[in-house]
Design a protein with these regions (language model features):
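Transmembrane alpha-helical segments and their cytosolic interface motifs
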Residues: 136-147
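C-terminal, charged low-complexity interaction regions
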Residues: 146-159
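Short amphipathic alpha-helical segments that predominantly mediate membrane engagement
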Residues: 2-138, 156-159
Length: 159
């Protein structure tokens, strides 16, 4: 299946869905945030998958959102890792949670992003955490779920 190569900034803004086909769209830095842009996974060098393209169609749709993980090595892309790091920091800094609750929530954060067999557990833990943490932490975790959560998480949380 012929896919294009996408160009995305380190903060997850999509610059081009098909930078390999339209090199004139390439930008070394993001015009929205100023971050460096990439076209390949920093861990393994695989191209970032853009959109499916058929030569006879001639139409290149834009990416809905930046992919969370590399298809070749499974590593989180920089924007995903950054979001996970921020969510971890929010959880660690909130005194309302016990050490065990912090550890459990942090361990299930990847299951908020990707739908896995553990996603339902992640939703239950997230709901529990949202009910006891400060409003600042709750707002940050809700925003994390809105921007990076899989559809099941968004649906279960009513986002």
């Amino acid at each position: 299946m012929p896919y294009t190569t996408a160009q995305i900034c380190l903060n997850g803004h999509c610059i081009s869905s098909a930078v390999d086909m339209y090199p004139e769209e390439a930008q070394p830095f993001c015009e929205k945030c100023g971050a460096k842009t990439i076209t390949a996974c920093p861990k393994c060098g695989a191209p970032i998958r853009g959109v499916y393209f058929e030569k006879n169609c001639g139409f290149i749709p834009e990416l809905d959102k930046a992919p969370a993980y590399c298809l070749q090595c499974g590593s989180p892309f920089p924007w995903t890792q950054s979001a996970l790091d921020v969510a971890v920091a929010l959880i660690e800094e909130d005194d309302s949670l016990s050490g065990i609750e912090r550890k459990q929530m942090i361990e299930t954060l990847p299951d908020v992003i990707s739908e896995t067999p553990k996603t339902k557990l992640a939703v239950i833990r997230l709901k529990k955490v949202l009910s006891v943490v400060s409003s600042f932490t709750a707002d940050g975790l809700r925003q994390f779920a809105i921007e990076f959560g899989c559809e099941l998480v968004k649906k279960q949380l009513g986002l």
